[in-house]
């Protein structure tokens, strides 16, 4: 049996641009892609914290060190520059693989610079007033 598990997550990234007339996808800074274990063309889910919309698209590699989080194509109707988003990739694992799998969690600041890396899915952004997801009722 395969289980679908979280593989990579960029938490609370700020959307830098949205272009309705660009070929559909999400452009992500290559540094963030590496940290979250994402590859060009990989399917990701994008959760818009600002308005609650969720969408599925694929990744395009953005300029390294630029902080770019660009929403392209039809998804630009659901996400606007300045919105906070969570970008999530999943992987299918056997039970044996699941036992040793560690997700890649990337926390970023308002400029999409990496502030912390980890594998705890419930850990809040360091230095924020967020509560751990593990502590919620």
UniProtKB/Swiss-Prot annotation:
Single annotated GO MF: aspartate 1-decarboxylase activity
Domain of life per record: Bacteria
Subunit structure of this chain's protein: Heterooctamer of four alpha and four beta subunits.
Top-tier EC class: lyase
Posttranslational mods: Is synthesized initially as an inactive proenzyme, which is activated by self-cleavage at a specific serine bond to produce a beta-subunit with a hydroxyl group at its C-terminus and an alpha-subunit with a pyruvoyl group at its N-terminus.
Active site, renumbered: 25 (schiff-base intermediate with substrate), 58 (proton donor)
Species of the source: Thermobifida fusca (strain YX)
Protein name as catalogued: Aspartate 1-decarboxylase
Cofactor entry: pyruvate
E.C. designation(s): 4.1.1.11
Reactions listed under catalytic activity: L-aspartate + H(+) = beta-alanine + CO2
Annotated cofactor note: Binds 1 pyruvoyl group covalently per subunit.
Function: Catalyzes the pyruvoyl-dependent decarboxylation of aspartate to produce beta-alanine.
């Amino acid at each position: 049996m395969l289980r679908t598990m979280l593989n990579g997550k960029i938490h609370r990234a700020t959307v830098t641009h949205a272009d309705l007339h660009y070929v559909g996808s999400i452009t992500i800074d290559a540094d963030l892609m590496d940290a979250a274990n994402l590859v060009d063309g990989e399917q990701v889910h994008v959760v818009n914290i600002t308005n609650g919309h969720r969408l599925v698209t694929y990744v395009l590699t953005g300029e390294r060190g630029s902080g770019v989080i660009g929403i392209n194509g039809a998804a630009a109707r659901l996400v606007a520059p300045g919105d906070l988003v969570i970008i999530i990739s999943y992987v299918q694992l056997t039970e044996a693989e699941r036992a040793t799998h560690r997700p890649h969690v990337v926390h970023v600041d308002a400029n999409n610079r990496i502030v912390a890396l980890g594998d705890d899915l419930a850990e809040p952004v360091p230095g924020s007033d967020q509560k751990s997801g593990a502590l919620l009722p």
